[in-house]
């Protein structure tokens, strides 16, 4: 095998091993996150709402406001807005 082929093989192996290590770290982190959600649930917190809050916190403020406005429009169109909001 030529040096170029050996070098390419070594590079490929290095990439694969790095990806495998990162995948293992990702699994460990996912397990840790799952444990935190379990802990929060055991203390009475709603994990669906926690996930929603985390999702909202990741959004840009303008993006969040735009999505809220679209959601409000859809809810109004379907008659799902509470009476207090309709009067406002």
Curated annotation (Swiss-Prot):
Source taxon at top rank: Bacteria
MF GO annotations: DNA binding
Name of the protein this chain belongs to: UPF0335 protein NGR_c28390
InterPro entries in the cross-refs: GapR-like (IPR018753), GapR-like_DNA-bd (IPR046367)
Spans through the membrane: none
Family in the record: Belongs to the UPF0335 family.
Organism whose genome encodes this protein: Sinorhizobium fredii (strain NBRC 101917 / NGR234)
């Amino acid at each position: 095998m030529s040096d170029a082929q050996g070098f390419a093989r070594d590079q490929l192996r290095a990439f694969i091993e790095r990806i495998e290590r990162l995948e293992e770290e990702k699994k460990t982190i996912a397990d840790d996150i799952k444990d935190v959600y379990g802990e929060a649930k055991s203390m009475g917190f709603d994990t669906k709402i926690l996930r929603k809050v985390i999702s909202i916190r990741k959004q840009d403020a303008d993006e969040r406001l735009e999505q809220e406005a679209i959601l409000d429009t859809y809810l109004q169109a379907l008659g799902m807005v509470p009476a207090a909001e309709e009067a406002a």
